[in-house]
Amino acid sequence: MLTGKHSHANGFTDNTTCVFDGSQQTLPKLLQTAGYQTAIVGKWHLESMPTGFDYWEILPGQGDYYNPDFIMMNNDTVREKGYLTNIITDKSIDWLEKGRDKEQPFCLFIHHKAIHRDWLPELKYLTLYEDKEFSMPDNFYDDYEGRPAAAAQTMSIAKDMDIIYDTKMYREGMKSRLKKAYGLSLIHI
């Protein structure tokens, strides 16, 4: 979304060894040219400092859920006390209310970490369901049964394909469903 290019074309092909090249054209730069104020608060994870933003406060790397550090526009790192989702939301609202020219159009990128693993709740909710067990609902998984296997066979790629899965991500009995749906070798990690 930032450049409108696929990763192989924008040069950022992985999150561990690459550094985003901020000199290329980006959506925030185009918005600035069109008269918009631009800001980003939260997860950046591009190993470079944001360009094309009038204001930014970003997390170093993945960031931490609790008492996270933020890299500020002056390159100082500031530790904030609290839960990351609340902090990002508060910082975003603060910029909307006090940090921008209300007479100008704006685009604010609010990048929450909570949609990324490990999913950790606010501390007050950490033990809320500690002693409870929940069954997986019958409709938890999609019902595209048969479609992946048919597509793989039609494309003649089934013979060269392995499905790699992590048991922490699948409930009991999923191995047999995966094997039945794909008819392929399964590699358990």
What does each model-found stretch correspond to?
Residues M1-I187:
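Formylglycine-dependent sulfatase
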